Amino acid sequence: MTDTGTGAGPGTAAPGPASAALRAKLALAEPVLHRATARLWRPGAGLTARYTRYLGAMYHVIRASVPLMELAALRCAALAADPVAAPLARYLHHHIDEERGHDDWLLADAAAAGADPGGIAGDTPPAAVARLVGAQYYWIEYHHPVTLLGYIAVLEGNAPAPWLAGRLARETGLPDAAFGTVRRHADLDGGHRDDLDRLLDRLPLTVRQRTAVAVSALHTVDAVAELFRQLAAAGARPAPAAIH
């Protein structure tokens, strides 16, 4: 295993508030994600099927959350000389407890929506999910566990709108029980993002570490947007051919 984290590059902390810098970068990139999200939740024919596909894909994303954080915490333990490692590990251990079981919420929602939870859990995850999650495994293992903070910043900084669960319930006719995860994350994720901002501003991040967090975050925006575009397009009818 190659450690190219704190051993490579300047050892002084980067100037300026890290959380504000990351938010500024994401503000430039996130319109792409917002457009993909709007496309996914567009009203009309196919919304129920799109929502069910979303539950399945997000199950495969979210079930990786705790293992990713556990791996990152383990890597922190191997970086005892790195001043970022110990506070990062404390944050991860706390966050692991908060995130555990969220994949089960998605399976419960899928069952309420009439889908087969066992089938979802046994499905091969889409390649777009592997692209989203797999990059984090690589960066944690072969670069530095702090990169995971960019991933977390995007997932928790783009929580469902508080009104989304109600709108989807009305337009799909599915029971309220099918929207538990959307509703809970609308309530929880804003506070989690604030916690992450405080951590980013406390950590003595080097310039290269701040860059790594930003690269991870921007990749996550792109990968989630691509996943949502695929979910929105799956099963869509092709446009009718023009008549000449």
Where are these regions (language model features)?
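Non-heme di-metal
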Residues: 2-3, 9-244
